[in-house]
Amino acid sequence: MAAFIKDSFWGQIIYRLSGRKLFRHNDELPDYVVPEKYLLDPKEEVLNSSDKSQSSENKEQTEGDQATIQNEPASEHIIVTWDGDDDPENPYNWPFAWKAIAAMQIGFLTVSVYMASAIYTPGVEEIMNQFNINSTLATLPLTMFVIGYGIGPLFWSPLSENSRIGRTPLYIITLFIFFILQIPTALSNHIAGLSVLRVIAGFFAAPALSTGGASYGDFIAMHYYSIALGVWSIFAVAGPSIGPLIGAAVINRSHDADGWRWSFWFMAILSGVCFIVLSFSLPETYGKTLLRRKAERLRKLTGNNRIISEGELEDGHKTTSQVVSSLLWRPLEITMLEPVVFLIDIYIALVYSIMYLIFESVPIVYAGIHHFTLVEMGATYVSTIIGIIIGGAIYLPTVYYKFTKKLLAGQNVTPEVFLPPAIFGAICMPIGVFIFGWTSSPDINWFVPLIGMALFAVGAFIIFQTLFNYMAVSFKVEYLASVFSSNAFFRSVSAGAFPLFGRALYNNLSIDKFPVGWGSSILGFISLGMIAIPVFFYLNGPKLRARSKYAY
């Protein structure tokens, strides 16, 4: 764990405050041998290489050197890379246990902030009574939080890929602000103030959502990345699913009209614990940031200012207009010009929105029809977690045999390998919605609608995973942050807006004994139509990629 603390948020601060004496790296230890390339003047190296030929032995040594030299007169840099393929400071070379610990920490962060969206739901009735407002206004803080973490990725995703910043400082600083915001939120006495605080909290919760999956890719090889992304997504989807149960439990335990406030006190405690743990133990994982720090250390060690990292070169050449473009314009441009991104954004936004509408309909079914207590009603949301686990049990082996195993065997794999499972998930989702809607009746056992919720979760999870991976392997790496940030924006804004009219949708279409039947049917029929999207990609994917300037 000492290695983790060394590259953690506080570890880096202590390192610098101690004058680089504490938490030193391998290249700062007395027995470290500086590679010869870092000691040479690039001009001298260019002259030497042009004046005399090298033996085959020297060529092999040059190919194995840990720095590549750009011979252009304009650059004359020594580019820092890892000390060999087995450099222990390269996150890809971490032992499995280290990778598992880092993955669990990022998963803990994701759950800790992501459950804040739906933990608010059980307190809606109390807020309506206390503030004397209707259900639409009472739902507004939920909407604002979701919209907040939809806007956040447009800003945070590009910053996380700047070598000067990296992943961990962004996680820790925004997590601290998120933690602080829970205090005034819990003390709020007006729905407007509550809504404003929630949208700000959602904005600062966004890095876990927008960058968590990318962090897994920093230390997990491409062959296994699809599986790792599936594991991270279980954390991401489990957060909103267990939020209502925890919210119901803390509200019920408070025994007063202000019980809803305890949802936010709980979030303050949880995010505070998460901040303390991760700020001391979550290491930096972004390779370009780690190499930038290494370049700084080598410049100090050797006095050679020509030593530079790839990240420093990239960031130094970006103009203000390029930064603004990557932050705001490129995600919009890709969404408008790429049919794949546009259609997947619409589909994922629908899936996300239906999930939050189902969360809104649960009180109608289980409090209104079956007369469940607040905690009993909160427990019904566990069915979505069960569905997610089942979806993962289907998806993970499938992607291993259809994608990972073939890559390990050196076979060529096209992105369309993810689409047959996507079609399966697309079929499961509307079936689950119909079952939930038409079995939510006083004449039918309360357990049956939960089967529909679980089946919906199976389909939703598989759709998320397959379509995200389809985009990840279809588009060039330098555009992925924009691709995923546009998707996060679309789905979050849509999911944030849907709950505002969710109650009205169900109430206006309610019939005797089936209060959510026709409302759910509308969602189910729309979902049926959306099955055409993965089918269309399966049939036309190669043609679409061939016409794209952003795709491989």
From Swiss-Prot:
<keyword id="KW-0196">Cycloheximide resistance</keyword>
<keyword id="KW-1133">Transmembrane helix</keyword>
<feature type="transmembrane region" description="Helical">
    <location>
        <begin position="381"/>
        <end position="399"/>
    </location>
</feature>
<comment type="function">
    <text>Probable transporter. Confers resistance to cycloheximide.</text>
</comment>
<feature type="transmembrane region" description="Helical">
    <location>
        <begin position="477"/>
        <end position="494"/>
    </location>
</feature>
<feature type="transmembrane region" description="Helical">
    <location>
        <begin position="168"/>
        <end position="188"/>
    </location>
</feature>
<dbReference type="InterPro" id="IPR011701">
    <property type="entry name" value="MFS"/>
</dbReference>
<feature type="transmembrane region" description="Helical">
    <location>
        <begin position="137"/>
        <end position="157"/>
    </location>
</feature>
<dbReference type="Pfam" id="PF07690">
    <property type="entry name" value="MFS_1"/>
</dbReference>
<feature type="transmembrane region" description="Helical">
    <location>
        <begin position="225"/>
        <end position="246"/>
    </location>
</feature>
<feature type="transmembrane region" description="Helical">
    <location>
        <begin position="194"/>
        <end position="213"/>
    </location>
</feature>
<keyword id="KW-0812">Transmembrane</keyword>
<feature type="transmembrane region" description="Helical">
    <location>
        <begin position="262"/>
        <end position="282"/>
    </location>
</feature>
<feature type="transmembrane region" description="Helical">
    <location>
        <begin position="346"/>
        <end position="362"/>
    </location>
</feature>
<keyword id="KW-0472">Membrane</keyword>
<keyword id="KW-0046">Antibiotic resistance</keyword>
<dbReference type="InterPro" id="IPR004734">
    <property type="entry name" value="Multidrug-R"/>
</dbReference>
<dbReference type="GO" id="GO:1990961">
    <property type="term" value="P:xenobiotic detoxification by transmembrane export across the plasma membrane"/>
</dbReference>
<dbReference type="GO" id="GO:0015244">
    <property type="term" value="F:fluconazole transmembrane transporter activity"/>
</dbReference>
<dbReference type="InterPro" id="IPR036259">
    <property type="entry name" value="MFS_trans_sf"/>
</dbReference>
<dbReference type="InterPro" id="IPR020846">
    <property type="entry name" value="MFS_dom"/>
</dbReference>
<keyword id="KW-0813">Transport</keyword>
<feature type="transmembrane region" description="Helical">
    <location>
        <begin position="445"/>
        <end position="464"/>
    </location>
</feature>
<dbReference type="GO" id="GO:0046898">
    <property type="term" value="P:response to cycloheximide"/>
</dbReference>
<feature type="transmembrane region" description="Helical">
    <location>
        <begin position="100"/>
        <end position="120"/>
    </location>
</feature>
<dbReference type="GO" id="GO:0042910">
    <property type="term" value="F:xenobiotic transmembrane transporter activity"/>
</dbReference>
<dbReference type="GO" id="GO:0046677">
    <property type="term" value="P:response to antibiotic"/>
</dbReference>
<comment type="similarity">
    <text>Belongs to the major facilitator superfamily. CAR1 family.</text>
</comment>
<dbReference type="GO" id="GO:0005886">
    <property type="term" value="C:plasma membrane"/>
</dbReference>
<feature type="compositionally biased region" description="Polar residues">
    <location>
        <begin position="47"/>
        <end position="56"/>
    </location>
</feature>
<feature type="transmembrane region" description="Helical">
    <location>
        <begin position="518"/>
        <end position="539"/>
    </location>
</feature>
<feature type="region of interest" description="Disordered">
    <location>
        <begin position="46"/>
        <end position="70"/>
    </location>
</feature>
<feature type="transmembrane region" description="Helical">
    <location>
        <begin position="419"/>
        <end position="439"/>
    </location>
</feature>
<protein>
    <recommendedName>
        <fullName>Cycloheximide resistance protein</fullName>
    </recommendedName>
</protein>
